[in-house]
Amino acid sequence: MAVAANNQYFIADADVVIAALGDPGEARLRLDASLRRIPHKQDPMIAIEHMVLAATTLGYGTCWIGAFDEREVKRILKVPERLAVIALLPVGVPDENPPPKPRKPFKEIFFRESYGTPLEL
């Protein structure tokens, strides 16, 4: 799987790798043409992010993988052709504990009513 994910070899050390799949055909049945390309990706991405939060809360390390050879991942996992591989999520016990990265100040990323107007709490 690490080779299929552009040689991101840490994937091979993960205890488990979750593949998020979507069904583009399902969206065609439910939505008009302007929205069809969204839900088959959006719903699995929401689920993956919830898994990231849950795993982190439990002390596991995760890394959302979006760079991969979809055909190769589908071959390895025997995913039906009609489904799309949206993301990979390796989960495991981290082998390091780096300090948190610096974050932008709240006022630089949250705005009130229009971009550039800081949200005051």
Q: Residue locations for each model-derived region?
A:
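A glycine-rich helix N-cap at a beta->alpha junction
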Residues: 8-14, 78-100
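Glycine/small-residue-rich phosphate/adenosyl-binding loop
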Residues: 1-47
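Short, charged/polar surface micro-motifs in flexible loops or helix N-caps
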Residues: 23-27, 70-71, 95
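Glycine-rich, flexible loop/turn motifs
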Residues: 7, 64, 75, 102-106, ...
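C-terminal helix-cap and adjacent tail motif
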Residues: 88-121
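Small-aliphatic-rich amphipathic alpha-helix that forms the alpha element of a beta-alpha
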Residues: 18, 33-76
